[in-house]
UniProtKB/Swiss-Prot annotation:
<dbReference type="GO" id="GO:1990830">
    <property type="term" value="P:cellular response to leukemia inhibitory factor"/>
</dbReference>
<dbReference type="Pfam" id="PF00622">
    <property type="entry name" value="SPRY"/>
</dbReference>
<keyword id="KW-0963">Cytoplasm</keyword>
<dbReference type="GO" id="GO:0061630">
    <property type="term" value="F:ubiquitin protein ligase activity"/>
</dbReference>
<dbReference type="InterPro" id="IPR006574">
    <property type="entry name" value="PRY"/>
</dbReference>
<dbReference type="InterPro" id="IPR003879">
    <property type="entry name" value="Butyrophylin_SPRY"/>
</dbReference>
<dbReference type="GO" id="GO:0008270">
    <property type="term" value="F:zinc ion binding"/>
</dbReference>
<feature type="region of interest" description="Disordered">
    <location>
        <begin position="1"/>
        <end position="20"/>
    </location>
</feature>
<dbReference type="InterPro" id="IPR001870">
    <property type="entry name" value="B30.2/SPRY"/>
</dbReference>
<dbReference type="GO" id="GO:0006816">
    <property type="term" value="P:calcium ion transport"/>
</dbReference>
<dbReference type="InterPro" id="IPR050143">
    <property type="entry name" value="TRIM/RBCC"/>
</dbReference>
<dbReference type="InterPro" id="IPR043136">
    <property type="entry name" value="B30.2/SPRY_sf"/>
</dbReference>
<dbReference type="InterPro" id="IPR013320">
    <property type="entry name" value="ConA-like_dom_sf"/>
</dbReference>
<feature type="zinc finger region" description="B box-type">
    <location>
        <begin position="17"/>
        <end position="65"/>
    </location>
</feature>
<dbReference type="GO" id="GO:0045087">
    <property type="term" value="P:innate immune response"/>
</dbReference>
<keyword id="KW-0406">Ion transport</keyword>
<comment type="subunit">
    <text>Interacts with TRPV5 and TRPV6. Interacts with YWHAZ/14-3-3 protein zeta.</text>
</comment>
Length: 402
């Protein structure tokens, strides 16, 4: 079947040879409708056809255009294949060799640095053990000296006492009166022997084991191994009405307006923006981290359960009483505070996270910045009773990280 007898369409000439026919007109599909993106016959493309006014071109022209596109695409694919082949042949072997070389160098670096750290730790261990031994020897020698001194004192007192008893039992009145000066001298000699007094020289000084290097390495190890094992959450009963507590009980947000939703109770702080954790510690080693990067006014530390909760006095204010030990920040001022004593800390910038290490075995509280590996401050004291992690925030938000 051919397009003969069909109404003339756009352009001139008859359609291509036999092939698929138009289902509507039975003519060869010799034209292409760009609007409908399909082949059409001359009748469809003519004045009365359905594609009148559309973008019409001959089918062979459209086919030639597609052939040219295919050729261009094949050339691009050939170039792409060549580039990939060259990359696989030339670049990847070098990358692989460089990766092997860099991995070997990285291993050497790790070994070198850990070897240096190990050597430094061994040297520090030896130095500290020698200091401990030296302090033990010093205390032991002081005790021996005291033993000798008091043995001599006892012997002298016994001699004086024996002499005085002899005078008392063997001398008559006149002889006793004649010995008055001797009695006075012996009594004065006895009075010159003082009673024993408590002396730190007789005690082992635990400060001999304190080392900035050891403390820093120890804090890093403790935070890395223990932080996260403590499931520290805030006790909602203690939260100040000026604070909002998150659903997971780990985030405190400061509010300038006092919340009316908080029911007052004996555990709740009613003035200062404080909160206690639900967990307390009486012994052992504990560590936790707090995200403080969003706040310029906060306090983090530990407090005794005896910390008062009511009123605006210093007895309820963290760091201003005998029941709380805290690291605090106000703008660019950093301090460690306890019982109204505030120790300034010379920090150039505020930590993003604050690590807290509580070692109740040796009665030590330590604050640490994980990002820089810096011990911000350490406090040694005999802590009374169970201790609770404690928090205060007067700007934005702080969160228990883990």
């Amino acid at each position: 079947m051919s397009a003969e007898g069909a109404e003339p369409g756009p352009g001139s000439g008859s359609g291509p040879g036999p092939g698929p026919l138009c289902p509507e007109h039975g003519q060869a599909l010799s034209w292409f409708c760009g609007s409908e993106r399909r082949p059409v016959c001359a009748a469809c493309a003519g004045l009365g056809g359905r594609c009148r006014g559309h973008r019409i071109r001959r089918a062979e022209e459209r086919a030639e255009e597609l052939r040219n596109k295919i050729v261009d695409q094949c050339e691009r694919l050939q170039l792409q294949s060549a580039a990939i082949t060259k990359y696989v042949a030339d670049v990847l072997p070098g990358k692989n060799q460089r990766a092997v070389s860099m991995a070997s160098a990285a291993r050497e670096l790790v070994i070198q640095r850990l070897s240096l750290v190990r050597s430094l730790c061994e040297s520090e261990e030896q130095r500290l053990l020698e200091q401990v031994h030296g302090e033990e020897e010093r205390a032991h020698q002081s005790i021996l000296t005291q033993r000798v001194h008091w043995a001599e004192a006892l012997q002298k007192l016994d001699t004086i006492r024996t002499g005085l008893v002899g005078m008392l039992t063997h001398l008559d009145d006149l002889q006793l009166i004649q010995k008055e000066q001797e009695i006075f001298e012996r009594t004065e000699e006895a009075e010159g022997i003082l009673d024993p007094q408590e002396s730190e020289m007789l005690n082992f000084n635990e400060k001999c084991t304190r080392s900035p290097l050891l403390t820093q390495l120890w804090a890093t190890a403790v935070l890395g191994s223990l932080s996260g094992t403590e499931d520290i959450r805030i006790d909602e009963r203690t939260v100040s009405p000026f604070l909002q507590l998150s659903d997971d009980r780990k985030t405190l947000t400061f509010s300038t307006k006092k919340s009316k939703a908080c029911a007052d109770g004996p555990e709740r702080f009613d003035h200062w923006p404080n909160a206690l954790a639900a967990t307390s510690f009486q012994n052992g080693l504990h560590a936790w981290m707090v995200n403080v990067q969003n706040s310029c006014a906060y306090k983090v530390g530990v407090a005794s359960g005896h910390l008062p909760r009511k009123g605006s006095g210093s007895d309820c204010r963290l760091g201003h009483n005998a029941f709380s030990w805290v690291f605090s920040r106000y703008d660019q001022e950093f301090r460690f505070s306890h019982n109204g004593q505030h120790e300034p800390l010379g920090l150039l910038r505020g930590p993003a996270q604050l690590g807290v290490v509580l070692d109740l075995q040796v009665q030590e509280l330590l604050f640490y910045e994980p990002a820089s590996g810096t011990v911000l401050c350490a406090h040694h004291v005999s802590f009374p009773g169970p201790l609770f992690p404690v928090f205060a925030v007067a700007d934005q938000t702080i969160s228990i990280v883990r």
